[in-house]
Amino acid sequence: MELAQSTLSASFIDKGARQLLLNLLGRLEHGQLLLRDGGERHSFGVAGTDLHAELVVQDPAFYRRLLLGGSIAAGETWVEGFWTSPDPVALVRLLARNLTLLDSLERRLGWLSFPFNKVRHWLNRNTLTGSRSNIAAHYDLGNTLYQGFLDSHMQYSSAIYPSAEATLEDGQQAKLRTICERLELGPDDHLLEIGSGWGGLAVYAARHYGCRVTTTTISRAQHDYAKEWIAREGLGDRITLLLEDYRKLEGTYDKLVSIEMIEAVGHAFLPDYFRQLSRLLKPGGRLLIQAITIADQRHAQYLRGVDFIQRYIFPGGCLPSVSQMAGLLARETDMQLVRLHDHGHHYARTLAHWCERFLALAPELPKLGYSQDFIRLWHFYFAYCEGGFWERTISLVQLEAAKPGPAGWSGDLPVSGH
């Protein structure tokens, strides 16, 4: 009797949640959404638009989960197979074009789980010990996994494609070249890299520009991979590899680069991060940061919440905005902003390439110990981010700054890769 009542209650909640979602989707203004649920089809938005998306409900509990968990539950229920889409990127793009509606959905769907997610995110903050566990949770998943979908330079950051026809390999090599040229690296330079990855940039810079490189990571898996790579290349005399938190680094350097590491710093620690970058640079030194950014207009709202990526992909992660980084440079350092380059759409292309290669690898992943839930999680992660970059709710910038002192650089390099 109790089981029957529980089932009846769940069914009632599912129906109520379904009706609430359908009512909210009736306010869709941009693009067209087709929602399929069993034999029913519901169309929302504007017919004849350039953006069409489809959502197929596989389990009626989807609506209840969405009511209780909001956008995070949307990702969870994708992983669990409660819904699917023939093109999840298009669905993310459609929702990104309807941010007012999306905000309304988030306020009405998910308020019950918000306090739990916020507390959990706070517990993942990037203290010295927290940073190591957060980095390990993502980057120590196994080098074989990353080798399967990254390029030969093992670049887990956005490519900069030199042409519409360029491959992932072309784009990542162009990105490495662009970074080195914008820093105007030469044989007399000592470059500090905060966030080694698997060592690709350090090896590229030392090999092609003859500079000395000190590079640091707090991922044991990345450190061990980079150590072997540096030895194979015979670059041990040019590259110093550290397993150390950036906050503990000492000395001064001619040039400093940090590629998509700032997202792992955490909002509360950004002032310390910029002060440390400034301390580590010699007078006249140059800095290049490659960063995923959130739109300035949505930054405050973003800081108040927790999204799917922070919950399941990058624990402790937090995107900066361009204005925030410029403000921190001015308030916390003596550095001056020299140039800013936007490459957001290049990241959308990069993610599309990664996802294609990841899905091609997917049939082999269970043999390596990865579950179907993991595969679906990462598929959604790639689609979620790609859609955001295409619609510019997030973007990718390279920020160049300089310390006071003798410039030692031309300042008028041609800008490539836009």
Predicted features and spans:
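Feature captures hydrophobic
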Residues: M1-Q172, T178
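Conserved class I S-adenosyl-L-methionine
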Residues: P187-G195
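Conserved SAM-binding loop of SAM-dependent methyltransferases across substrates and taxa
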Residues: W198-Y209
